[in-house]
Amino acid sequence: MAPVLPLVLPLQPRIRLAQGLWLLSWLLVLVGGLTLLCSGHLLVQLWHLGTFLAPSCPFSALPQVALAASAVALGTGLVGSGASRASLDAEQYPPWRGVLGPLLVAGTAGGGGLLVLALGLALALPGTLDTGLEEGLGSALVHYKDTEVPGRCQAKRLLDELQLRHHCCGRHGYKDWFGIQWVSNRYLDPNDPDVVDRIQSNVEGLYLIDGVPFSCCNPHSPRPCLQSQLSDPHAHPLFDPRQPNLNLWSQGCHEVLLGHLQGLASTLGNMLAVTFLLQTLVLLGLRYLQTALEGLGGVIDGEGEAQGYLFPAGLKDMLKTAWLQGAGPHRPAPGETPPEEKPPKECLPEA
């Protein structure tokens, strides 16, 4: 049974392999740590912006899986640096001989699987942000006025902070506020004819105005912020709703948050790809180094050439060996049964 992808390693290539693995492992530690920070940053951002994402949006799974994958990659890099450094010393390597094989299996199956899953999520999940933000921001705008409703008390504060921090207004623009009631009934006078007319002017019985909350105002504008009667061209002669202006934020929060979160997801996806490449190289190098040293009794500077490989035999041979070992002692087929020898006849005594 021939080994899979064998590689002959003389003395100097073995030493260079161990030294290169040590540098590559520390590079994996660095990249894994940066990926860990990127995952944590995206997770914190989603924790702050979770109110504006639909509960059914699965995007939050990306930083969680990426966090676990980067932590395993960081651990793989630390193991690789320790094992490659110890392989250069015949006295330090023996403790690694018994644990390096299981660690390689765990790193390949666990770490590789998590990285592949995280990369798949980084490619697939950003597309779900569009509908998730659309639904979440729409719900946030509707509940802006519910400052006294249990469970919705913080909706106004969170949306005001969002618009001020990200320089956005409404879901797709400031006109989104015209179609919802964002003033609480607590502050409306039911005896005011204007209030009654506005409530009776729509079938839903909402108090709709052509104004926006204060958080839509640009504090850096040189002019006073115009918040009411924005659709009346005669109310504010200097304000033209058809032209860009400095008073209100021009972008909607959907566009701003979508670009922000997709940018973070893209950065995280690139970091995961680099981490996957480095982890693959480290695991392959460790496997070749381990199998080469096993042929030399764990001594890297042993005499002669050593052969490193990925698997001691092909997949078919490995499965056949495992099957034979699990099936117990071999029982020959009926055609293979050797003929039984007849017992020798006993000689009768002569009379």
Swiss-Prot record:
Signal peptide (residue range): none
Residues in compartment: Cytoplasmic: 1-19, 85-102, 287-351
Q: Which InterPro entries does this UniProt record tie to the protein? A: Peripherin/rom-1, Peripherin/rom-1_CS, Peripherin_LEL, Tetraspanin/Peripherin, Tetraspanin_EC2_sf
Q: Where in the cell is it found?
A: Photoreceptor inner segment membrane; Photoreceptor outer segment membrane
Query: Residue ranges of region Disordered?
Result: 325-351
Coiled coil ranges (UniProt) are none
Sorted alphabetically, the keyword list is: Cell adhesion, Cell projection, Disulfide bond, Membrane, Sensory transduction, Transmembrane, Transmembrane helix, Vision
Asked if Cell membrane is a keyword of the record, the answer is no
Q: Could you say which tissues express the protein in this record? A: Retina photoreceptor (at protein level). In rim region of ROS disks (at protein level).
By its UniProt entry, which Pfam families does this protein fall under? Tetraspanin
Write down the superkingdom of origin: Eukaryota
Compositionally biased spans, kind Basic and acidic residues: 339-351
Instruction: List residues traversing the bilayer.
Output: 20-43, 65-84, 103-125, 265-286
GO terms, biological process: cell adhesion; visual perception
Q: Which residues lie on this side of the membrane: Lumenal?
A: 44-64, 126-264
Note the topology in the membrane. Answer: Multi-pass membrane protein
Q: Which GO terms describe its cellular component?
A: cell projection; plasma membrane
Family, according to the entry, reads as follows:
Belongs to the PRPH2/ROM1 family.
- Function in brief: Plays a role in rod outer segment (ROS) morphogenesis. May play a role with PRPH2 in the maintenance of the structure of ROS curved disks. Plays a role in the organization of the ROS and maintenance of ROS disk diameter. Involved in the maintenance of the retina outer nuclear layer.
Q: Which disease is it linked to?
A: May be involved in mammalian retinopathies.
Quaternary structure note: Homodimer; disulfide-linked. Forms a homotetramer. Forms a heterotetramer with PRPH2. Homotetramer and heterotetramer core complexes go on to form higher order complexes by formation of intermolecular disulfide bonds. Interacts with STX3. Interacts with SNAP25.
Name under which the protein is recorded: Rod outer segment membrane protein 1
Query: From which lineage does this chain's organism come?
Result: Eukaryota, Metazoa, Chordata, Craniata, Vertebrata
